[in-house]
Amino acid sequence: HKGAHFIGTNPDLNIPTERGLLPGAGSLITLLEAATRVKPVYIGKPNAIIMDKAVEHLGLKRQEIVMVGDNYLTDIRAGIDNGIPSLLVTTGFTKPEEVANLPIAPTHVLSSLSEWNFDEN
């Protein structure tokens, strides 16, 4: 339909599962974008729309929050791009060997969330 809005949740091309990588929302959105020639408006991570709502809901300052995730492109960039400290856990999508080549470093990097000291951070 001409003039309809095209809203996407997130640009994740793949999602890790127990069976390996499967197509994520971004892969389907990319297909629809190519077919319709309409650019989507993403409302999920890493975009400000969802992050601003989360900060508002928490009622905290951005520096009092830590964005935790295993995917640099969505989870960690959500923190970086929105002024929120980030914690990359390398147990999922982003692997330990990729960390040194990331364009902007996360605030913290751990191999497991169990390494995080909740009393000190």
PLM regions with names:
Residues 1-121:
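Asp-based, Mg2+/Mn2+-dependent phosphohydrolase catalytic module
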